[in-house]
Amino acid sequence: MEKVLVFGHKNPDTDAICSAIAYAELKKELGMNAEPVRLGEISGETQFALDYFKVEGPRFVETVANEVDNVILVDHNERQQSANDIESVRVLEVIDHHRIANFETSDPIYYRCEPVGCTATILNKMYKENGITIRKEVAGLMLSAIISDSLLFKSPTCTEQDVAAARELAEIAGVDADKYGLEMLKAGADLSGKTMEQLISLDAKEFQMGNAKVEIAQVNAVDTNDVLVHQAELEKVISAVVEEKGLDLFLFVVTDILTNDSVGLAIGKAANIVEKAYNVSLENNTATLKGVVSRKKQIVPVLTEAFQA
């Protein structure tokens, strides 16, 4: 049987990795030869989850057409966030919870996108719909994905469906969601030992906003000053990325997991759009974004609207 690769976006977060593993397992249970892979490095937060539930991380690939003809996307759909040669393979399915942009296919496909906080929440439903029992380890990874995407249920993207799914999965996994979740988030917020290049690419995504090319990177921290003390070095590496990729804006967002506020560092010729979008003034290229924790709900749509205004 021909193999199908299942993967999340580049610079994968916990949902991208864990949902690839969970969905590949579901597809295997349903008779497909599916393998989860990843398009980037595994973050400290994700590694904590993999280690905790004793699951091996997926192998890394840069291209997919050299291995398979068919792929399944989880936690993304936009081409620039996917495999470098995504145009050379057939996308069989997409399971996602983001905006739909820069995506089209030549054939009809199974496309499931729901306005929930996490792909794993959708997968929890799909396991039930197919009558497949979720293994303890996989339930733990799916729980980890929901906790990560919802910032332990505090993000505005978090829905009642996400909370309910997390409680179900925590029971299967045999953990206390709140206690485990805080440990996992703290592991992810430990940025010691990371280079500046790693910091700005840990969780970075590219977007087309009107005619502008924008990259938004986000890291979680227990204290934003722990990251911003390196601002001069950060600006240097961000400026290099802006020039290399021809970006109009690179927004580096440092989110405080205790206060649920963020600080944005904006570099690029369109940095003023951040001021316009949030009604703030950039001082030394930074501004506090009160109550902003979600790139998907509080950054991407707000900036997109500002660019198109």
UniProtKB/Swiss-Prot annotation:
Record bears the keyword Nucleus: no
Subcellular location per the Swiss-Prot or TrEMBL entry: Cytoplasm
Catalyzed reactions: diphosphate + H2O = 2 phosphate + H(+)
Pfam families, A to Z: DHH (PF01368), DHHA2 (PF02833)
Co-factor: note: Binds 2 manganese ions per subunit.
Residues annotated as binding Mn(2+) 2: 15, 75, 97, 149
InterPro entries for the chain: DDH_dom, DHH_sf, DHHA2, DHHA2_dom_sf, Mn-dep_inorganic_PyrPase
Example GO molecular function: inorganic diphosphate phosphatase activity
Domain of life: Bacteria
Binding positions (Mn(2+) 1): 9, 13, 75
GO cellular component terms, semicolon-separated: cytoplasm
Enzyme class (EC, first level): hydrolase
Subcellular location, principal: cytoplasm
Protein name, per record: Probable manganese-dependent inorganic pyrophosphatase
Taxonomic path: Bacteria, Bacillati, Bacillota, Bacilli, Bacillales
Gene: ppaC
